[in-house]
Amino acid sequence: HTISRRQRQMCIRDRSGIAKLYRQSGLFTWQLRGGSRDSLRPGLQDPWKGNATRGSDIMAYRSSPASSDEAHASFAWLRDLRAEGSVEARSRARDLITDWIGANSSWKLPDWRPDLMGERLAIIAMNYGWYGDSADETFQSRLAHSVEMQLRCLAMDWRRMRSVDQQIGALRGIALAEAALGGEDSRIEALQDMLFPKIRNVTHDDGGHVSRMPDRHIRLMRQLVEFRMATSLASVDGSALSDTIKRMGAVARMWRHGDGRIAHFNGGGGISAEIAEETLLRAGVHGKTIQQAPYSGFLRMGSGRTVVIMDAGDMAHGDDIIAGSGTLGFEMSVGPTQLVVNSGQMMKDPTLRRVMCSTAAHSTLGLDNQNSSSPRDGRLASISGVEVGEAPGGLLAVGAHDGFERSHGIIHHRKLYL
């Protein structure tokens, strides 16, 4: 007989509830234990800066990592204490880590959520040389045993994570923890072999993220830079991974305005100029900025201090993608001043975000308050005739889309001359 949707959802909830009860049991904790490694290796160095002001606030008890469950569980505050840099900050870091281990000796949410475990393991491993190498043996041993438990749990969970981006984040946490624990080179190599198909699933051949979301693209780049550190410590060949990072870096670089910030296409605008700069630096991107990412669908023109960046790609769509209906929209800056920008869609309110995703919220042609694409109606603008290059006295970018053809019988052709 057939099972109704409601019955199916109840079955899923029942299985989820049983699994949660098992994970909270002593049997599951016993399953995670049994590690034989007593300390981490200090060879990794976190490539990302913390915030010294936030670190000082933690030291002065003006703020507490525990004030936010997710921020506390990710251990992002460890970078801030490292940036503060004092001996007292190192001691405070050890105390906070010891407290967390004591409160999380067995599985519980949200701290043991896979995405948070991946982030936490990466930060623990990459900063160990600062806070852990000079600690006493009791701290080192207790931390190593906790890391091994988390490592086993994440190894069970990462394949069930919803998005490929999240799975990559988990794999980088596993790789860094394995490298820091002195795992065999073959383990890191096997993890890298699992990583490459995931990367191919979420990137175009030109290096751009398939979501066409600049902020998401840069977050993925940072995770791959971290994974590469694990291959280096384990003496595993990471040259292919480096090539991937450089391709992604070339696309990220073409999104930058004169002030160093990233263009506001498709949910962009949340990455600071400082984070963009340090990411590109670690990516090792050199040479001339590219003018076109043909598969990702972006063009760039630069003349003197003026930069024009154009969205010339088909709209991406998916449950976890923020896609603006800004086909053939552009942004323009002169030096550090942004003159023409899109609104971005970083707001949490779904209604406001939907408004900011509309064609009217972008620097492109709109007709009768209608979006150029509407995934809900099965109507997606198709791009054609995209080119960028030299023209008499300057540069020219051209493209066309048919988003209004069905409704208005109109093809939108755009030419931008700089």
Language-model region placement:
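Tryptophan-centered motif/residue detector
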Residues: G55, M59-Y61, W77, W100, ...
